[in-house]
Amino acid sequence: LKGKFIYYVGPVDPVGDEVVGPAGPTTATRMDKFTRQVLEATGLFGMIGKADRGPAAVEAIKDNKATYLMAVGGAAYLVSKAVREAEVVAFADLGMEAIYKFVVEDMPVSVAVDVNGTSIHATAPKIWQAKIGKIPVVDAAAG
């Protein structure tokens, strides 16, 4: 797994000529308690999921020079179009909970935690508030 990503996903069965059915991200926060162990044991480049990561996970990501990318929740069909190949590599009997190997191209993701441990969930709200505070409020009811 060295140099690869883990994508927290439960893909739906493909229909017709699809490689995989809708493949939206699952919440990564529930994996926080395993993040350090997984990164140190595997040499992963990073993880892909949705939602923010807790302080311990962010620290583990930083310490291992890894990254955490967010895929768009609610856009499972869009994400699935980036999957070029899909192969079940373990636990096929678990269906969508099996372990898959995906080959992806142009997957729509955003960097949520970079190799320096900078989390968009910590930095973005301050930036947004500063920008929103500069937007003039117009009372449409006042005419």
What are these model-predicted stretches?
Residues 81-143:
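C-terminal binding/interaction regions
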Residues 1-107:
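Feature captures the catalytic cores and cofactor-binding loops of soluble hydro-lyases/lyases
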